[in-house]
Amino acid sequence: MKLLYIVPKLNNEGGVARVLSLKLNYFVEKFGYEIHVLTQNKGDFPLFYSFNEKIVFHDMILSGKAFYFFNAFRKSLKEKVEAIQPDAIVVCDNGLKAFAIPFILSGEIPIIFECHGSKFVEEKQLKSDLISKIKLSLKYRFKDFSANKFSKVVALSNESLSEWNVNNGLVIPNPCWIQNDISADLKSKKVITVARNSYEKGLDRLLLIWEKVIKKHSDWILEIYGDSITYLQPIVSDLGLGSNVSLNEPVKNISEKYLASSILVMTSRSEGFPMALLEALASGLPCVAYDCPTGPRAIIDNEVNGFLIEDGNVDSFVQKLESLIEDENLRLQMGKNAKESIKKYKIDGIMEQWEELFKGLNCLKV
């Protein structure tokens, strides 16, 4: 089986890059698939995560404004697919150009859309004027129309699938790469979050929450790991959080950081199926997260392995986070439940679902 994955970038430390390193390596090492990856890495190597040396990477060099950018994308895509001749194509791109792929590649090759984010994901705060609202509505209608042109739409949770008005969808969650018997002892006075500094990840919201928390718990530290994280320093300084917030660039030994923490927090405005939550639960950490679209609800069992907070409810978030800070027994019980809840995300069972999907599609005329 020859598979082509289309991904914007893999030369970063994000959750999509993490999960694709797991899955693509598994396809090569366990199933013997031939894997090709088409990216816009712009030749920036080495990759942050480890990919099997048999995986073949192809780079699209795209530039210019909208029309020229899209035309270069269309031309490069057709040339690469013609050269590779894959048995199936998997698109892991939430950008608008990804939804044009079924129209660009109108051939016999099955094309799967693997959705790693909310349909309503936005990279910046939306404008409220009428023209902006009309543009937004048209964009979502185009996404729905295009999604039905894919051979399959694979969502990571039932909640994510319900966002799409499609009749060709199914759910296959992400696997968790941390599978061991070690758990955090939950005695440290550290709260951790792992996220890139972007509008959708909502780290600005987290700092406002943390400002309230340390008024009672000034001996606790919030550790943030992610790219472009230093841009948060002015906010940290303005809020007077310098002694209680540690800003850190991405690290490859992130599992050690989870084990040295007691709680994970997530304040994203939108998600797909956040790997940070899976990793934290696998490390035995209770989690507190906003119930944003989509992902946290599928992973956190409220009041069992963590707390799911009404999106944007700062006071509720502070209250639940403080309850975990103040009650070690509650942390320990939720941490134990967290470890148990991660078992259903073992990689073997999830990858078997992907193999069955590919086998089925190759038996169909598309």
Language model segments and positions:
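A conserved mid-protein helix/loop that constitutes part of the nucleotide-sugar donor-binding site
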Residues: G14-L22, K189, R196-K212, D315
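Short His-centered aromatic/hydrophobic patch
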Residues: V91-K97, C115
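Conserved acidic donor-binding segment of nucleotide-sugar-dependent glycosyltransferases
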Residues: D301-E303, F307-V314, E322-N329, K343
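A short, well-ordered alpha-helix in the C-terminal region of glycosyltransferases
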Residues: S316, S323, L330-K344, Q353-E356
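N-terminal strand-loop element at the rim of the active site
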Residues: I6-E13, Y26-Y68, E163, S228-T230
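Aromatic "clamp/platform" in nucleotide-sugar-dependent glycosyltransferases that forms part
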Residues: P250, R269
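Short hydrophobic beta-strand element within catalytic cores of glycosyltransferases
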Residues: P286-Y290
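Membrane-proximal helix-turn-helix segments that form the acceptor-binding/catalytic region
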Residues: S132-V153
